[in-house]
Structure formats: C-alpha cells, structure tokens
Regions:
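Conserved H-loop
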Residues: 11, 76-82, 84-91
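ABC ATPase nucleotide-binding domains
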Residues: 40, 118-158
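Conserved P-loop NTPase "ATPase switch" module shared by AAA+ and STAND
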Residues: 47-60
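Helical segment within the ABC ATPase nucleotide-binding domain
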Residues: 62-75, 87
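H-loop (His-switch) and adjacent beta-strand-loop-beta switch element
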Residues: 93-108
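Short acidic-hydrophobic catalytic motif
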Residues: 110-113
Length: 158
C-alpha cells in the first residue's frame, strides 16, 4: 500500500487476517498496548518519516494522543494508525475502513464519517462528538456537524 507522505491515516480494521499487515513491511511498526511515556520516548528518537501504529494508542487518553500527534508534527513524521477505535479517526486526515481484508470505505475523515449506516453495520458507530452534534441539529441547537469537541463546546457556549 502506498501512502501520501503529507497525510496522516487511520485504518479502521475489523476481522483482518495476518496477511493484511504484510503490506506494511517497509514501514516501522510500533506495536500495541504501549503506555504514554514509553511511546513518547520511542518517538523522540524515531529515525523514519512515517510510523505505523498497530493499536498502539489503546491505553492513551485523549490528551496523550494529542501530545503524541504534536510530537510527530514537530519531528515532521506522518503516521498510519491501525485501530478498531472509531474515535481515533478524528486524529487523522484520511480514513480507510476494512472489513475482513476488504476495503469498504475510503476518503477524508469527514467523508467517511458521513457513511453512518455502513459504519454501524460494521460495528463502529460514530465518534461521540460527531454523533452528539448530529443529535443537536435535530433540535436546532446546532446547524452543522462537528468533528472537534473543543470547537463544539466553544460554539455551544457562544
């Protein structure tokens, strides 16, 4: 798989087999279940300009994930985040959704998240902030869908 060097990706995976990961053999892969300090330390001396995370963010809080992304930006490192957590899709520019090794959806984050029925069928749903903002449009409290909780909160208070 080829990735654009200027784009951060989230790959939402559902029931993929081991061969799926062979397409990343040319990339540096950071494995799963790492804690923040360990992950940060590893990235501070990272030699490559592209890193693949395989469920590496599972134990991280939202603020820790943002901190990791800031560190990656500072070092000019782009990422591919392989995950089953729909919330992580909001941290990248581009999302590819796989089900059993078959690509189901692909596009910029907002385009993919507009496919709520397909995502729910695959067991994902929508990120909380997206779902909340959609629900609030039904009550005419908001007039658009939000992809960032800070922006949603700011607009609600104004």
């Amino acid at each position: 798989m080829m990735f654009d060097d200027n784009v951060n990706y989230t790959l939402l995976v559902n029931n993929v087999n081991k061969e799926f990961f062979n397409q990343f053999k040319d990339y540096s892969i950071i494995g799963n279940n790492m804690f923040f300090d360990e992950l940060k330390e590893k990235l501070e001396m990272f030699p490559s300009k592209r890193v693949v995370f395989n469920e590496s963010w599972f134990n991280l809080s939202g603020n820790e994930k943002k901190s990791i992304i800031e560190l990656l930006k500072k070092q000019n490192i782009n990422f591919v985040n392989i995950t089953s957590n729909i919330e992580d899709s909001l941290l990248s520019n581009y999302v590819i959704v796989y089900d059993e090794d078959k690509k189901v959806l692909e596009g910029n984050t907002e385009v993919v998240l507009r496919n709520e029925k397909i995502l729910k069928k695959l067991g994902y749903g929508l990120p909380f902030v997206v779902d909340l903002s959609i629900q609030l449009t039904y009550y005419d409290i908001l007039d658009k869908v939000y992809y960032n909780m800070d922006k949603l909160t700011e607009d609600l208070w104004n």
